[in-house]
């Protein structure tokens, strides 16, 4: 996506679905894989799905590091959405539980917004500063990451978000 922002610079964006989270998908795929192994009949496609779902989170972290110039240290990152899917406060196996600690552990200042995930997120994601709205989270941020597809985020004015950021990277 290349959006015009003040100064004519485009917004740098990477579009990739993070992975499938929640408690059911990982539990069910692991159970299927275990059943196959117990019966000496591995289900390689299911085992591959499990591996890919985990690898996608790692690749996302690598892409975010690249967008930050090789390090999260000293960067401010706005994270929109921490629940595993919209319209819930459920964070079981959410991508944010892998990605946000990598940001914080790498020295980033993380500002997060989630319409329903703040209460759980405060316990599960230490070191995160919680904001009430995406525009406040994005102000002077070096990077903005959307981890959950809340309808509230679909309606955001991306040009307004980008123009408030230190560097327009989404």
Regions found by a protein language model. Give the residues of each.
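Structural/interface elements that position substrates and couple domains in central-metabolism enzymes
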Residues: 1-170
């Amino acid at each position: 996506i290349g959006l015009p922002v003040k100064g004519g610079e485009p917004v740098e964006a990477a579009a990739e679905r993070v992975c499938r989270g929640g408690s059911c998908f990982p539990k069910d795929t692991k159970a299927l894989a275990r059943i196959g192994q117990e019966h000496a009949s591995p289900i390689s496609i299911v085992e591959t799905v499990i591996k890919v779902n985990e690898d996608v989170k790692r690749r996302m972290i690598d892409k975010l590091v690249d967008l930050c110039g090789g390090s999260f240290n000293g960067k401010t990152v706005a994270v929109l959405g921490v629940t595993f899917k919209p319209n819930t406060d459920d964070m079981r196996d959410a991508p944010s539980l892998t990605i946000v600690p990598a940001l914080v552990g790498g020295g980033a200042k993380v500002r997060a917004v989630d319409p329903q995930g703040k209460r759980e997120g405060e316990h599960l994601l230490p070191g995160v500063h919680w904001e009430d709205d995406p525009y406040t989270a994005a102000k002077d941020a070096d990077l903005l990451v959307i981890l959950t597809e809340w309808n509230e985020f679909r309606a955001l004015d991306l040009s307004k978000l980008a123009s408030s950021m230190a560097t327009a990277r989404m």
